[in-house]
């Protein structure tokens, strides 16, 4: 049997644990360790997926020398960890966003490029691995929709999102960034100018927004509308309400919801289960997250380009920065796009 890639995960909260599960279940990887600031959590995940728990990244690197590393810690504590991981020579899969702000994202990319430009580094934008969005991109690339004129992207969560994520991140950088990247990726255009308005309620205590609606001007002449919020009540029938709609001179493509057509009616109420991102059935992880991690493994294994480069991830974050500037000034804002070398 061909040698497996050794893999490890730094940060095993909700998403990091799923990274560990994906490596454990992939036939091309051997999960050799996990790290978390909460060592008891690390031990629990290690036991679940038959690997070893480490107290620090340095200890993990020294003992295991992993070839691929998922970095799933919060973006506000990621910088030094990512640099240390890059210096180890591993190929990196970073959770999105790259950093809490654009300046730190640029600095991180500069450092990673100096250290290990020849490695396969990528960022986990799961919509690129969602077959529904990939289908729309393919149709656009084939010209089936003609010239793209408008795009509408919606991503609504409940107010539980504000409670969980509000103290350390914000709606635009954690949630809207998915759709910003999806708009650019599917259409093959960049977002050049933005104008945004917001509603601030519960998130006022953390100095950011509960809801944002924005107009985006694309480099191909199209106009996009973004709607995102953490407003719906916690008992809402769907944990995530997403929509993506593209209109062109030759047709229309549309994604509605994330429940894959499944509706549940029971004594407890009505539910649209989230079945697109990371569903688990019979102990097996599937969905866009599994696809994204499997793609990263294949990129390293077969020497292919990743689904998203660090530059593209950075440019999605640059749109977030422009939206934040527009909210602050009340004016339309140009997006600071940069070209970088990604190999």
Predicted regions and their residues:
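Contiguous beta-strand/loop segments that form the cofactor/metal-binding neighborhood of enzyme cores
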Residues: 180-260, 290-302, 340-343
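Beta-strand-loop-alpha-helix segment that lines the small-molecule cofactor/substrate pocket
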Residues: 63, 67-68, 74-75, 79-125
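A contiguous active-site-proximal alpha/beta segment in oxidoreductase catalytic domains
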Residues: 99-161
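Hydrophobic residues in well-ordered beta-strands that form the structural core
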Residues: 55, 93-94, 121-123, 152, ...
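Mid-domain beta-loop-alpha active-site segment that forms a flexible
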Residues: 124-131, 159-195, 207-210, 312-313
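Conserved SAM-binding strand-loop segment of SAM-dependent methyltransferases
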Residues: 51-57
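N-terminal Rossmann-like dinucleotide-binding module
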Residues: 1-49
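C-terminal helix-rich "cap/oligomerization" subdomain common to oxidoreductases
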Residues: 1, 68-70, 118, 295-343
């Amino acid at each position: 049997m061909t040698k497996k890639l050794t893999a490890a995960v730094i940060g095993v909260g909700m998403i990091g644990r799923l990274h560990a599960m994906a490596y454990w279940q992939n036939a091309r990887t051997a999960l050799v360790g996990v790290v978390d600031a909460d060592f008891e959590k690390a031990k629990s995940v290690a036991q679940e997926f038959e690997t070893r728990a480490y107290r620090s990244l340095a200890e993990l690197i020294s003992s295991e020398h992993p070839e691929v590393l998922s970095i799933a810690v919060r973006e506000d504590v990621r910088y030094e960890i990512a640099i240390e991981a890059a210096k180890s020579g591993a190929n990196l899969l970073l959770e999105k966003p790259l950093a809490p702000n654009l300046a730190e994202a640029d600095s991180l990319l500069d450092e990673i490029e100096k250290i290990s430009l020849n490695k396969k580094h990528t960022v986990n934008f799961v919509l690129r691995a969602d077959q529904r969005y990939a289908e729309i991109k393919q149709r656009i690339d084939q010209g089936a929709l003609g010239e793209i004129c408008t795009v509408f992207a919606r991503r609504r969560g409940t107010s539980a999102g504000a409670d969980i994520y509000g103290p350390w991140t914000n709606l635009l950088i954690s949630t809207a960034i998915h759709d910003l990247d999806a708009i650019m990726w599917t259409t093959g255009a960049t977002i050049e100018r933005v104008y945004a308005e917001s509603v601030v309620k519960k998130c006022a205590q953390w100095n950011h927004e509960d809801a944002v609606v924005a107009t985006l001007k694309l480099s191909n002449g199209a106009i996009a509308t973004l709607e995102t919020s953490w407003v719906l009540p916690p008992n809402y029938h769907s944990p995530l309400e997403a929509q993506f709609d593209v209109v062109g001179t030759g047709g229309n493509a549309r994604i509605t919801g994330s429940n894959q057509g499944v509706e549940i009616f029971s004594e407890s109420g009505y539910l649209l289960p989230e079945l697109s991102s990371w569903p688990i059935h019979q102990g097996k992880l599937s969905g866009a997250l599994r696809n994204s991690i499997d793609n990263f493994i294949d990129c390293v294994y077969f020497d292919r380009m990743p689904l998203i480069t660090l530059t593209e991830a950075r440019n999605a974050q640059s749109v977030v920065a422009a939206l934040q500037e527009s909210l602050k000034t009340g004016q339309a804002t140009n997006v600071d796009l940069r070209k970088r070398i990604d190999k």
